[in-house]
Amino acid sequence: MNAGAMGGEFCDLVENVTFLMPDGRLREMAGEDLTVGYRRCSEAREGVVLRARLRATGRSSQAEVRRRIDEFAQRRWDSQPRESSAGCIFRNPADDSAGRLIDRQGLKGESLGGASVSNVHANFIVNRGGATAEEVIGLIRRVRSKVRDSSGVVLEPEVTLLGRSWEEAFN
């Protein structure tokens, strides 16, 4: 995963990273050698990130850093749900917003068991209480299908499944 928000991506700051591979060995890589793209890092699919060294980007006073943290936190507080979620579910397609496409289908509030499309931001699925992984995946499947059927846009998941691929989950 190459996490990002508000115009920046995590991998832009990585100097090096250490992965724990499935066979138990450690793999270290320089940031510039990572295969990254929008919300993805190929190497992170092969192993688990144990640590990363980040590079600083300029110098700011402690007060300026605190002001920017507070500003970003307020923007998130104003635009994202407060319930438990995994963050944005789908990647934004070219020239559009996944949340806008989902909202156009009237899917805010759509539920499956304890999982529900957020009323605050349609690209979030929130846990209203006791949601299982299968309920969340089922709701993701339903939302993806409704958007595809109405607009022709196939939304791609941004979140990572553990233990199986999205291809398996969608079939």
Model-derived regions: residue spans:
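A gly/ser-rich beta-alpha-beta helix-loop segment of oxidoreductase catalytic cores
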Residues: 1-15
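Phosphate/pyrophosphate- and phosphate-bearing ligand-binding catalytic cores of soluble enzymes
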Residues: 20-138, 145-171
